[in-house]
């Protein structure tokens, strides 16, 4: 009989990506939930409508991906995003942009946001973000 234990340790186990949806607009949070449900292999672990709720949930829960509305983030809050990324290096952050400009994307990168997603392009752009995060999660689990 062949011992498969060594082989199985090399294969990454797949588990759903745990997502926190943070947007001031409840209707848009529901839209994101529907998109994520269609995409599959992820679970919405929580929702937040304020930055205080975001910080509370990401520090108390095991979240893989934070979908964060840029309008919730002031210039001071961008510094908080950077600090959060330093405290929780495994957390991936996708900033949801109402106004998708190169300047916004550059600011997101500068403050340690991993992805920028245009709100009006969420259905087209979110699958690539989830695929990237799934690869990271699979690597951690393996």
Features from the language model and the residues they span:
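Non-catalytic signal-transmission and effector/linker regions of two-component phosphorelay proteins
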Residues: 1-20, 24-28, 124-142
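Two-component signal transduction core modules
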Residues: 66, 93, 116-117
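Alpha4 helix (beta4-alpha4-beta5 surface) of REC/receiver domains from two-component response regulators
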Residues: 79, 99-117, 121
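Two-component/phosphorelay signaling modules centered on CheY-like receiver
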Residues: 26-46
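Conserved phosphotransfer microenvironments
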Residues: 67-84
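Conserved phosphotransfer cores of two-component systems
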Residues: 59-61, 84-91, 111
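Acidic, metal-coordinating helix/loop segments flanking the phosphotransfer/catalytic sites
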Residues: 47-65
């Amino acid at each position: 009989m062949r011992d498969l234990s060594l082989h199985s340790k090399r294969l990454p186990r797949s588990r759903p990506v745990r997502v926190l949806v943070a947007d001031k607009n409840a209707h848009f949070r529901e839209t994101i939930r529907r998109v994520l449900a269609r995409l599959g292999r992820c679970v919405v672990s929580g929702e937040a409508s304020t930055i205080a709720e975001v910080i509370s949930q990401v520090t108390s829960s095991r979240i893989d991906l934070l979908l964060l509305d840029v309008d919730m983030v002031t210039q001071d809050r961008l510094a908080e995003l950077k600090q959060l990324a330093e405290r929780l290096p495994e957390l991936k952050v996708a900033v949801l942009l109402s106004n998708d400009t190169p300047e916004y994307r550059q600011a997101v990168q500068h403050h340690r946001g991993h992805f920028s997603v245009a709100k009006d392009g969420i259905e087209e752009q979110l699958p690539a973000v989830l695929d990237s995060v799934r690869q990271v999660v699979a690597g951690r689990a393996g």
